[in-house]
């Protein structure tokens, strides 16, 4: 068969399947902080299932574990870096106030 008459064919490339983020030995539990923290964003939000590459059941278990850890105050509800910064206080004056013109 002539090359111009051949149907379009995709080149067969071998691809390497990525390892699942949760191994068979990993236990999804609210006390397993090293596992849970992998599925949180920098702001402390739960990452989506597509981002995590988890199955539906795994994502549900991760979500429940994160929520339990938040309620038991093992995890913060939000990571606010601004909240930790302190603003310098303005010194108070004890004398009478004067108006500036």
From Swiss-Prot:
PANTHER family: 30S RIBOSOMAL PROTEIN S18, SMALL RIBOSOMAL SUBUNIT PROTEIN BS18M. This is Small ribosomal subunit protein bS18c. It is found in: Plastid, Chloroplast. Residues 1-26 are annotated as: Disordered. HAMAP family: Ribosomal_bS18. Signal peptide: none annotated. GO terms for molecular function: small ribosomal subunit rRNA binding; structural constituent of ribosome. GO terms for cellular component: chloroplast; mitochondrial small ribosomal subunit. GO terms for biological process: translation. Keywords: Chloroplast, Plastid, Ribonucleoprotein, Ribosomal protein, RNA-binding, rRNA-binding. Gene3D superfamilies: Ribosomal protein S18 (4.10.640.10). InterPro entries: Ribosomal_bS18 (IPR001648), Ribosomal_bS18_sf (IPR036870). Residues 1-19 have a biased composition (Basic residues). Pfam families: Ribosomal_S18 (PF01084). It comes from Phalaenopsis aphrodite subsp. formosana. Belongs to the bacterial ribosomal protein bS18 family. Part of the 30S ribosomal subunit.
């Amino acid at each position: 068969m002539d090359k111009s008459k051949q149907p379009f064919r995709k080149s067969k490339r071998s691809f390497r399947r990525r390892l699942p983020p949760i191994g068979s030995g990993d236990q999804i539990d609210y006390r397993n902080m090293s596992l849970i923290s992998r599925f949180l964003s920098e702001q402390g939000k739960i990452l989506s299932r597509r981002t995590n590459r988890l199955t539906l059941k795994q994502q549900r278990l991760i979500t429940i574990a994160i929520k339990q850890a938040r309620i038991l105050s093992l995890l913060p509800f939000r990571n606010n870096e601004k909240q930790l910064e302190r603003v310098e206080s303005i010194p108070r004056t004890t004398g009478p106030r004067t108006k500036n013109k």
